[in-house]
Design a protein with these regions (language model features):
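Acidic/polar loop patches that form or flank catalytic/metal-binding clefts of enzymes
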Residues: 56-57, 224-227
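Residue-level "edge-of-site" marker
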Residues: 165, 228
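Cytochrome P450 heme-thiolate monooxygenase catalytic core
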Residues: 3-164, 180, 185
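Short glycine/serine- and small hydrophobic-enriched flexible loop segments
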Residues: 47, 166-173
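N-terminal start-of-chain detector that recognizes signal peptides
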Residues: 74, 96, 217-225
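Eukaryotic intrinsically disordered and solvent-exposed regulatory patches
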Residues: 32, 234-237
């Protein structure tokens, strides 16, 4: 299944990077990258979760609507969903996104029922439930499956977009690190940059993996713990409890 995800991710990445390069030939001036990277990440997430059960025309619409949902979570917002408020717009956006995700769940069920092979997370979910030996719950409605994908999609936009942008900036700020990443790519892929990346090649990209981990350590996209006020200085000796 991981190879399916990798193929989807690479296809989307190549598509967006090619467009960026084409746009740069027309206008090479510096531009903000946040929304550009976010759009690529949104399409990547949708393809991994829903495959091509989501049409191309819907991706841009979902991307725009999800931004309204993100805006509604700002710290200072009018809390009552009156028309025109960010919270109201987010509620309407959620309804539209859910309709697309429910449609994707329905199409996935039809595809697997007709003997199709899994090509995304939804397909794999439906396929596993259809296996004779599966003893778990099987009666998930399209709406329930869409809710799960909606949650995954929100998490991917919150954390992954931030991590992607931070990683890009860290490479831009550290050209010597970028040069090492490129040397490793040339070695692992032997200069064949047009060939699809394989899982084995990904495993061999040890330096790239280290760069990603270090980027997340230096600038965590999402903090998993609350900040604490420390009265006394930290000790340089770190004790890790067993439990």
């Amino acid at each position: 299944m991981s190879s399916i995800y990798l193929e989807l991710q690479e296809t989307v990445a190549r598509k967006h990077i090619s467009r960026w390069l084409n746009e740069a030939t027309v206008d090479s001036s510096a531009k903000p990258i946040m929304m550009t990277a976010r759009y690529m990440n949104m399409e990547t997430s949708l393809r991994v979760f829903c495959g091509y059960h989501i049409p191309d025309s819907a991706i841009e619409e979902i991307n725009a609507k999800y931004w309204l949902i993100t805006q509604s979570l700002e710290l200072v917002n009018f809390p009552i969903p009156l028309p025109g408020t960010k919270v109201y717009k987010a509620i309407q956006a959620r309804k539209l996104v859910m309709r697309w995700l429910e449609l994707a769940a329905k199409k996935s069920k039809i595809t697997i029922m007709q003997g199709g092979r899994p090509e995304c997370m939804l397909d794999e979910w439906v396929f596993i439930m259809s296996e004779p030996g599966y003893k778990g719950r099987k009666d998930f409605s399209d709406y329930e499956m869409a809710q799960v994908i909606f949650s995954f999609l929100f998490a991917s936009q919150d954390a992954m977009s931030s991590g992607l942008i931070y990683g890009f900036q860290h490479l831009a700020d550290n050209p010597e690190v970028l040069a090492k990443v490129r040397r490793e790519q040339d070695c692992v892929r032997m200069g064949n940059y047009e060939d699809p990346i394989t899982l084995d090649q990904m495993d061999d990209m040890v330096y790239l993996q280290a760069v990603v981990k270090e980027s997340m350590r230096v600038k965590p996209p999402v903090l998993m713990v609350y900040a604490l006020i420390v009265i006394r200085p930290f000790s340089m000796i770190i004790l890790i409890p067993f439990q």
